[in-house]
């Protein structure tokens, strides 16, 4: 892919963006390379730029909370990582593999084909705002479906693993219940079990509590807490739950106009934000609550 030449103005602007988006030193410097890396990623819808030369590295096992106003690029970040949306420029890497490019026979990077993308994407699981369960399948069947059909897992093994995962999310007594027989919080927990059934190394959560009332919201957040405490999963979470982000995340990224406007530990972002726009956002959230 041939990228346009950069002007001096472009280079100056990108240098500024890079300084804003440089990740704080939060992991042991002896750890391995990032498990997820966004490199100069740009995504536009017509004239609206939703991701603007974005750079972000996520360490293995790191829990990153993504906050910010609507339209700032938070959910788009997860969608391009899951390849639900394409990007206009840049590269996304998962472990040692590029999600966007692959080497041809001559070792030259070319746009990745579908087979390559599917292989790399299999390392990622995602839970959405909407539950998207199959209404004609029980909770157990919803969790079994993808491992059998996509991974080719033995049905007996898939059933045993699905039962274990539903037990993990607190639904061991709901295996034979249909979505219509479950509360919203229970359906979202089935969706989490379904994503885990694919054995991902990275889990994405896109405002998973936005459609739930406060009590049901707590059920889902408790499951995510449990996953974070008991499993070495890397997590990227778009959330409006500031209390949860403060308590659970290793790092908080504040998005604004397609850029990481500010990032740091939860204490740095919530107790001592440095950017005026971050302060304004957190003040507005506090007043709304």
Locations of the language-model features?
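ABC-family P-loop ATPase nucleotide-binding domain
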Residues: 1-42, 289
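ABC family nucleotide-binding domain
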Residues: 33-266
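C-terminal boundary and immediately downstream tail of ABC-type ATPase nucleotide-binding domains
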Residues: 2-3, 256, 263, 267-289
